[in-house]
């Protein structure tokens, strides 16, 4: 009985580690998450995405809609339970309600992964985890930046800048109009791990040039990993234990002055 109570107390006090995955549209974030969910290695992973349909999860993997859903749908987010014990949430407008849903299921979650839209600034999202409502339940395990290596080699940063611009114009919640180069630098400045995606079709000189560009913008000691088709082992992606929310204020980005103002609530954070 004592051991059971101690285990229950540990589950209630344990913080859920959250990995934030950033990168432009077309970089391969969704491909990466799809591979992670289907190769979870027994981990019960909850994933927050903007659109569930983009993940392309096979219908047979869906166990059912456990919470946050009703027959008319849920505007602020839906939670899907997968057959392997993982969860998938959508968040289109408000961040806080979805986090509250996940906090209520903390004993069923080993790790949380948040995929940003690509235009979202990663630093304010990490800073949201400093708020007491999140800090007591979650910790930012790491920020992972997915880089489209061929696009960077071509000086474009994103695979399809026209599509990224269309995404920008379609997002009413976007509160900045930063050039892609600045966003790219911000994504790298906040990174704990950088994934160089799609390097399999590049020659060594191109890869070396991309690595030089990326290393110039990343903090010292950040690891660069070459990944093809999103195939990365869960043990590499998860479990870095960086507690990024404690150190994020010291990571300098282009938007630091904009981020300095006080927020009334973390609901306004863009994902």
Specify the residue positions occupied by each region the protein language model found.
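Nucleotide-state-sensitive switch-loop elements of NTP-binding domains
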Residues: 12-22, 27, 31-182
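Short, Lys/Arg-enriched N-terminal segments with co-localized hydrophobic residues
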Residues: 1-10
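C-terminal accessory "lid"/substrate-recognition subdomains
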Residues: 162-271
